[in-house]
């Protein structure tokens, strides 16, 4: 097993425009002040662990773990414009400020997300394919987006915006069980919230 480690301290890592950093047999660990991975790929066969002090820009890029877990910490994370965060067989943990997943895909067997400045998931897809999806944040904007869990979907936040301008344009929420704890409003005009069993709002 050959692991790969990149430690740049407070420096910037630029891997944009079809850049590829790939740990073919083991884990990948990256520590940097910022990461520009627009249209780039950071991939590991094992665990993929990123510690980014500032902004992580993954617009149109891919952060991937094939057989391990995806463990992300950053000041902010922009996964918009077709960005992909994927842990095919393991969990994904994210600790960040603002998490922008607009028109992006974030998926793993289970998800744990802490985004202190909010989550934007407009037209995005955020899914726990085999287990729970646990989110702690401020406002969560899911207008036109999809938020899913095979098991429990737990959201602790301020407002949840799931509305649309017309039928079929609202957000979609689906899970085995849903447990929302909101300090603010839930807007669901033309939106869908579906639970296979329990639904707590």
Where does each model-flagged region fall?
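Short, T/G/N/S-enriched strand-turn elements that build extracellular solenoid repeat scaffolds
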Residues: 1, 16-22, 37-43, 58-64, ...
């Amino acid at each position: 097993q050959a692991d790969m480690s990149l430690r740049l301290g407070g420096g910037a890592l630029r891997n944009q425009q079809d850049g590829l950093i790939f740990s073919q047999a083991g884990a990948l660990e990256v520590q940097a002040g910022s990461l520009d991975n627009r249209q780039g790929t950071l991939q590991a066969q094992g665990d993929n662990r990123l510690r980014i002090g500032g902004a992580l820009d993954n617009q149109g890029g891919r952060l991937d773990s094939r057989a391990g877990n995806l463990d992300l910490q950053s000041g902010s994370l922009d996964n918009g414009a077709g960005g992909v965060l994927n842990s095919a067989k393991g969990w994904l943990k994210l600790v960040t400020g603002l998490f922008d997943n607009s028109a992006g895909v974030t998926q793993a067997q289970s998800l744990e997300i802490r985004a202190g400045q909010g989550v934007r998931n407009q037209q995005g897809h955020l899914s726990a394919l085999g287990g729970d999806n646990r989110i702690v944040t401020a406002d969560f904007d899911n207008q036109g987006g999809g938020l899913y869990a095979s098991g429990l979907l737990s959201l602790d936040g301020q407002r949840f915006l799931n509305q649309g301008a017309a039928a079929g344009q609202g957000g979609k929420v689906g899970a085995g069980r849903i447990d929302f704890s909101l300090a603010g409003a839930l807007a669901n005009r033309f939106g869908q919230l579906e639970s296979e069993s329990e639904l707590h709002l």
